């Protein structure tokens, strides 16, 4: 600001001083005293407009110019006096009368002129350059001519996360490797790695008890020794606009190929390469009317979670395979309430999915998703899902989401093999975490001679899963840009049948001492801060309490961080996010959880995530 004002100030001072000192007594010029000039210069120096050496130089220059002007004026007056008599005597009768006034032109020092020229040139150059850059960006100079049209339609995305995961186990935890998977009463507890046990089910090493005794590090999940891991996730995606409303997308990601709820790669594979997989591959069609309002969306392939939900039911990293469609009935379209409103990223808050909906609409979403392909098609495992809800922009940017969902998982529950048969081996789960009630598909009664374990050799889920889920989210924007998001989530498994389990399976539930229905889950959560952490200094904090009984939801798809994955857990979650730059932010979460049923099993988990994206 000072550099822009300074040349003008110097010009005013120089011009005013010179004019005042050179003026004749009859001129209409206000004389400026030397003391006034000095005081003015001192004031400008104090205000920071001029530097001290510039002020002193200005005063000296003004004094010198005044002296020279005064000397010149004296000589001019003497010359006029010497010639005045002759001029008066010989003046023609028709000559013009003299006014007695002299015109003066203010003198501007050269250094002031130079500074003005340099300042104007620099400011003009900056303004022109900025205008050119803006026009080039807006009009896309050079791109249409240099690249094919289809290239300009492709939009890349990238994100990367490095995680420090520290896990602290309760010192009084029961079971575990040290106790051979037994609780204090000698009951089988584990916690067991069911996938590792099932892999050897039909081999000479098969059987839970044999696996526990011969290979405890694989058969039993660690729940006593603290652990620190460094993990990394890398994702690279592309989405292409093929035509009006039609898009195609693909996303590559680091991945544990056998884990659908985590894209994390644990560091420590020196000499080996990371697993890199296609995490998403899909087509999406949006029907738009003449107002560009989206009434209908159709997804096919390996797609994003299309449902309004939380990580109580579905982990944030979970992708859905199949077909889904969403129909929206807009309301309040005749008002200006939606003008200027931009819906935030629906997954910006970790663990929350606000759905692929638009504000001020009623919606219905249906989906059919194959979970596992079996040789005989009637035995394929499926997820049939439906959701109805409302998305309401209440006032300004405050938004209310309500949804009721029903998720039916077909053919995921275990069936006991007939004697001497493997016919129901396919009912063993392809992936589980921990928590759901387990039963023996094969035991010493069904395949005596092949399986001699009294507990069992091959295990599956005891319960059917028909999950009702109700979710409510209210995003209050009264403190904008700080928002307050309140979330309530409730889930109930309607498919659990205790009598059927006890009738079909002789040993009943093998990982709990009872088979009573434990089928309820809920979460209460509050988020305070910016909706999206996208710039330096942006922040967000959250606090949640979660309670998930063992058969409330399918443990394979629920959050993989809370209680280190699975169900039968309750506890608190505290988290914060802070923006480090436009493309980087820090995420810190602390989770403290305990088992609801069974022997004591406590875990404290700390995750520190460094994230980057563009």
Model-derived features: positions:
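Outer-membrane beta-barrel pore domains
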Residues: 222, 421-614
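Gram-negative bacterial Sec-dependent N-terminal signal peptides
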Residues: 1-21
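Intrinsically disordered, low-complexity acidic Ser/Thr-rich regulatory segments
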Residues: 141-147, 200-229, 348-361, 443-463, ...
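N-terminal periplasmic/intermembrane-space "pro-region" immediately following the signal or transit peptide
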Residues: 20-220, 345
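Surface-exposed loop and membrane-interface regions of Gram-negative outer-membrane beta-barrel proteins
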Residues: 164-292, 307-315, 455, 493-517, ...
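Outer membrane beta-barrel
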Residues: 153-155, 225-412, 519, 523-557
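Secretion/assembly modules of Gram-negative surface proteins
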Residues: 23-24, 53, 126-157, 166-173, ...
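Internal, charge-rich low-complexity segments
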Residues: 165-195, 331-344, 411-432
